[in-house]
């Protein structure tokens, strides 16, 4: 396949045009008075959105060189979205501002490598300032504020705050479609896994077809149980206490299952057998989680624990165990809190090390179950288009809220980035030559988001910037919705610090890469055949 090449200034100009195409489409959505963008879909109804990353992902340019620039800006938006769940539009606006100024200076003869070095130094200083300004979230109202701003809805903000309060910092919150038009939170307390009773004869509530035991003993093993003999000693010990027994094993069959069912039906021993969750190594890890949560041990051949030797101390305990046809819930495990915390810390470390998204999700789910539960936000709407848009907003708001809990909050509305110009100004004074130019580019770019917010709301950005900088209070800023100057924290105009930091760092990273690009290589499009009819063969 033949290639096409572009060099130096011509290459950078093509990239800039691609960047502008995406940034101009995205930046009109910034701020409380940002506009919407309607995106045509190849099937189904069009999508109406004001989410930066959704818009950026849809843009594909015809000119292959310009399209490279567009793809780079998409990278800024999606990287910021992956890390912080929000701030994609801010990141795009910052990247465009840095690239515009950078290309101007590089074209005038500045060394792109030194310019990039200056950009990096200035960004490091700005990030420190963002950390200084940030405030930790103190209560549920703060969480609701952050979520409301990101989702542009107080109702959604309250739902997310309620869900986070219930499941805690490490809990899992998922977003699903509701069967009605209402949006609400469903909460599953305790450890829940998708395995139910092996036989319906274990059922204690025939109406609901479920097994409910209070204060049961829990036997946990990774073996397949078919012979009853190894179980008899522990079954006798449990029967003497008068408490029920829950058996979680790889499988229970044959003689073992028959004996357990008969004991249950005669009332000798209330029991239920449940298949262990997961497969392979994941099953072993989940059984260990259940053991730690309930204060028991896993009777495993690998560690040489025989079923005949088990004592009551080796069994787990819980306040309630509820078993349905294909679901088991363990509520109020009696495990040692310190051990549970250690296990959660261990899973957290695994999450940080893994690169697989699927692995990350399963680890987070395990952590949530240990931490105390899973919340599901059920999203309802009148039409499919509204449902898609609402679901997307909730997912975004959820990520932004988690980011706020992690690194705290800063004043929103582009104010924090504007305040971060102060330390950058010092860097500009300290540096010289082309590095100074790089730092100056960042200094100018930091005012781009507030400028755009003001423009979208119909105000003059330069006047607002001047007015805001007259006050030294980092929280003092401009409410573009009401057209008033105010304390941004008091007014509830806040952003997660992680979102602001990620937006700046990702924008600078792409700008630096783009400025140091000297050659573009793309595939040459194949010439189209204007004669679609095949030639007739000659006979």
From Swiss-Prot:
Any matching Pfam family: Cpn60_TCP1
Main location: cytoplasm
GO BP annotations listed: protein refolding
Top-level division of the source organism's lineage: Bacteria
EC code(s) of this entry: 5.6.1.7
Catalyzed chemical reaction(s): ATP + H2O + a folded polypeptide = ADP + phosphate + an unfolded polypeptide
Keyword Transcription regulation among UniProt keywords: no
Top-level EC class as recorded in UniProt: isomerase
Oligomeric and partner information: Forms a cylinder of 14 subunits composed of two heptameric rings stacked back-to-back. Interacts with the co-chaperonin GroES.
Similarity-based family: Belongs to the chaperonin (HSP60) family.
UniProt-listed PANTHER family: 60 KDA HEAT SHOCK PROTEIN, MITOCHONDRIAL
Function description: Together with its co-chaperonin GroES, plays an essential role in assisting protein folding. The GroEL-GroES system forms a nano-cage that allows encapsulation of the non-native substrate proteins and provides a physical environment optimized to promote and accelerate protein folding.
HAMAP family with a match to the protein in the record: CH60
Designated name of the protein: Chaperonin GroEL
Organism of provenance: Thermosipho melanesiensis (strain DSM 12029 / CIP 104789 / BI429)
Lineage, uppermost ranks: Bacteria, Thermotogati, Thermotogota, Thermotogae, Thermotogales
């Amino acid at each position: 396949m033949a290639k096409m090449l572009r060099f130096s200034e011509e290459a950078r100009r093509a990239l800039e045009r691609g960047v502008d195409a995406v940034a101009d489409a995205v930046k009109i959505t910034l701020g409380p008075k940002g506009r919407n963008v309607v995106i045509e879909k190849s099937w189904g109804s069009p999508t109406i959105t004001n989410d930066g990353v959704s818009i950026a992902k849809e843009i594909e340019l015809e000119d292959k060189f310009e399209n490279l620039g567009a793809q780079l800006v998409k990278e800024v938006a999606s990287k910021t979205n992956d890390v912080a769940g929000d701030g994609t539009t801010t990141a795009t606006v910052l990247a465009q501002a840095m690239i515009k100024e950078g290309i101007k200076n590089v074209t005038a003869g500045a060394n792109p490598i030194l310019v990039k070095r200056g950009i990096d130094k200035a960004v490091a200083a700005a990030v420190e300032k963002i950390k200084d300004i940030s405030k930790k979230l103190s209560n549920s109202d703060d969480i609701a504020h952050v979520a409301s701003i990101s989702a542009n809805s107080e109702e959604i903000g309250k739902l997310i705050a309620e869900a986070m309060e219930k499941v805690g910092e490490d809990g899992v919150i998922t977003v699903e479609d509701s069967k009605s038009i209402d949006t609400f939170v469903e909460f599953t307390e305790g450890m829940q896994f998708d395995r139910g009773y092996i036989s319906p004869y274990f059922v204690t509530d025939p109406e609901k077809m479920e097994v409910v035991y209070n204060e049961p003993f829990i036997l946990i093993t990774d073996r397949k149980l078919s012979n009853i003999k190894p179980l008899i000693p522990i079954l006798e010990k449990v029967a003497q206490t008068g408490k029920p027994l829950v058996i979680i094993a790889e499988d229970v069959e044959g003689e073992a299952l028959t004996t357990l069912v008969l004991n249950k039906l005669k009332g000798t021993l209330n029991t239920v057998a449940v298949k262990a969750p997961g497969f392979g190594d994941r099953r072993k890890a989940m059984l260990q989680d259940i053991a730690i949560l309930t204060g028991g041990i896993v009777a495993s051949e690998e560690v040489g624990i025989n079923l005949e030797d088990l004592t009551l101390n080796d069994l787990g305990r819980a306040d309630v165990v509820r078993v349905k046809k294909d679901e088991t819930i363990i509520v109020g495990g009696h495990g040692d809190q310190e051990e549970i915390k250690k296990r959660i810390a261990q899973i957290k470390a695994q999450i940080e090390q893994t690169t697989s998204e699927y692995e990350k999700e399963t680890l987070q789910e395990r952590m949530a179950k240990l931490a105390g539960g899973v919340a599901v936000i059920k999203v309802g709407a009148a039409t499919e288009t509204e449902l898609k848009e609402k679901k997307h907003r909730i997912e975004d708001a959820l990520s932004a809220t988690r980011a706020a809990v992690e690194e705290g909050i800063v004043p929103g509305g582009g104010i924090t980035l504007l305040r971060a110009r102060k330390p950058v100004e010092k860097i500009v004074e300290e540096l010289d030559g082309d590095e100074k130019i790089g730092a100056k580019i960042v200094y100018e770019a930091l005012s781009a988001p507030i400028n755009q917010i003001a423009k979208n709301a119909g105000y003059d950005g330069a006047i607002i910037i001047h007015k805001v900088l007259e006050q030294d209070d980092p929280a003092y800023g401009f409410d573009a919705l009401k057209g008033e100057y105010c304390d941004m924290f008091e007014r509830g105009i806040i952003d997660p610090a992680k979102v602001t930091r990620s937006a700046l760092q990702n924008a600078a990273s792409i700008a630096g890469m783009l400025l140091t690009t000297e050659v573009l290589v793309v595939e040459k499009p194949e010439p189209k055949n204007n004669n679609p009819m095949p030639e007739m063969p000659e006979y």
